[in-house]
Amino acid sequence: MRNSTPSKNHFSPPSIKAQHKVAKKRAIRRSRIDLSCGCSYYIHINCRNYGFSHRGQHHCSSTQEWRLYLGGAKSPLFQDHAAPSNSSRVPDVCDPNTDNVQPRVEESTADAQMLPGSDALPLFDGDFWDDIIDF
């Protein structure tokens, strides 16, 4: 009877499970932002200086105080991070009164731009439709 374990002479690629296990243990570098409404959200360290709306209020994630969670049993550290020195970076301008949402186009009952009105469509008599159905 053959042994059910694979032969040690054959080459097999490394298991993907081992790679996933290592990736899961890697610490995610993110910061926690506490909002005035009592909610909190986490943002990745590389995604700083972006804004969003929450409960009708616009928020910027460009605060100077970042709470870094390094994973494991370590307590959070408070650090002041300077913005990355990149000359092509857009300056951090976050105005809570700006509204970047485009208004909806009003719907109308007029004819579509691509189709002519129903008056311009050719009318076919009953004999035409009888020939089509009998075909």
Swiss-Prot record:
Phosphorylated. GO terms for cellular component: host cell cytoplasm; host cell nucleus; viral capsid. Belongs to the geminiviridae transcriptional activator protein family. It is found in: Host nucleus; Host cytoplasm. GO terms for molecular function: DNA binding; structural molecule activity; zinc ion binding. Coiled coil: none annotated. Monomer. Homodimer. Homooligomer. Self-interaction correlates with nuclear localization and efficient activation of transcription. Monomers suppress local silencing by interacting with and inactivating host adenosine kinase 2 (ADK2) in the cytoplasm. Interacts with and inhibits host SNF1 kinase. Binds to ssDNA. Strong activator of the late viral genes promoters. Enhances the expression of the capsid protein and nuclear shuttle protein. Acts as a suppressor of RNA-mediated gene silencing, also known as post-transcriptional gene silencing (PTGS), a mechanism of plant viral defense that limits the accumulation of viral RNAs. Suppresses the host RNA silencing by inhibiting adenosine kinase 2 (ADK2), a kinase involved in a general methylation pathway. Keywords: Activator, DNA-binding, Host cytoplasm, Host nucleus, Host-virus interaction, Inhibition of host innate immune response by virus, Metal-binding, Phosphoprotein, Suppressor of RNA silencing, Viral immunoevasion, Zinc, Zinc-finger. The zinc finger and the transactivation region are involved in PTGS suppression. It comes from Mungbean yellow mosaic virus (strain Vigna). Pfam families: Gemini_AL2. A motif (Nuclear localization signal) lies at residues 17-32. Residues 120-135 are annotated as: Transactivation. InterPro entries: Gemini_AL2. It comes from the Viruses. Residues 82-102 are annotated as: Disordered. This is Transcriptional activator protein. One of its GO terms (biological process) is symbiont-mediated suppression of host innate immune response. A zinc finger (unnamed) spans 37-54.
